[in-house]
Amino acid sequence: GMATRVQLALRNLLAWVRQEEGRAKLDDVLTMNVRNKYITRYNPGHLRQSASKVETKWRLLGLDISTPAAYAIVESMEDLQAARRVVESRESFVVKRDDAYGGEGIIVVRGRTGETYETSRGPMTADGIVKHVRKIVQGQYAGLALDGKALVEARVEASPVFAAISAGGVPDIRIIVFRGYPVIAMTRLPTVASNGQANLHQGAVGVGLAVADGTPVGAYQQSQHRWVDRHPDTGADLSAFPVPN
């Protein structure tokens, strides 16, 4: 049956990985360096160079896959007025740099009272948010690049499954697919330290998930270099929460 064929395919894949990576054991931790070696070896270089959130959004929409609505794409100073109109007309949204990594430049706007916006960086005004967009376009988070592109998009609400065990923000699930097969999965849970961002570098907790059924297999807070059994803020048990299909 189908299950037998999938098991056989996975068994063959694991045997191939053993041959390719003979120096490492399969139960070793997949470090960033090892992961990056796999990325470099098995992916065309131009894919990493074009890791654009906007481009990814258009590709997903073309495949009829849901993605947060884009309110504004700001590529130049001439686009700032459009960004301001979006900011002033909405109470909830997210500002991101198009191709930043590690959560750099993100502002999450959860609501507003009058002219004051409740954000992941504390109270802000429309002027302050637009100023942040301008800094993104001017290249503040662009590394060696001279300029950048900002994206203002809809804010995603957390699933009730994760809202109960996370400190605000929106947890996500990441799955590494190797040669067409899902091999490793994890969820990233925001904390107070990460300011509601599901970003491990900022303080979020990473919880490994069994690919077969989503069962938690261990939780680690990278920013504190420690394994944890419970969420540091909510106290939720991170060894037994359910992840539905």
Residue ranges and their predicted role:
Residues G1-S92, R97-S120:
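Conserved N-proximal alpha/beta basic substrate-recognition cap immediately N-terminal to
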Residues S52, R85-V87, S166-G169, N245:
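Short, glycine/acidic-rich beta->alpha junctions
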Residues L47, V207, A236-S239:
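Flexible, active-site-adjacent loop/turn segments at secondary-structure boundaries
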Residues S120-H225:
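Phosphate-binding site of ATP-dependent enzymes
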Residues N43, S66, R90, R134, ...:
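Short, structured coil/loop segments at alpha-helix boundaries
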Residues D229-N245:
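Extended, compositionally biased non-globular segments
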Residues V54, E78-Q81, D127, K131, ...:
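Generic alpha-helical secondary structure signal
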Residues G62, T113-G114, R121, G214, ...:
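Intrinsic-disorder/low-complexity loop/linker signature
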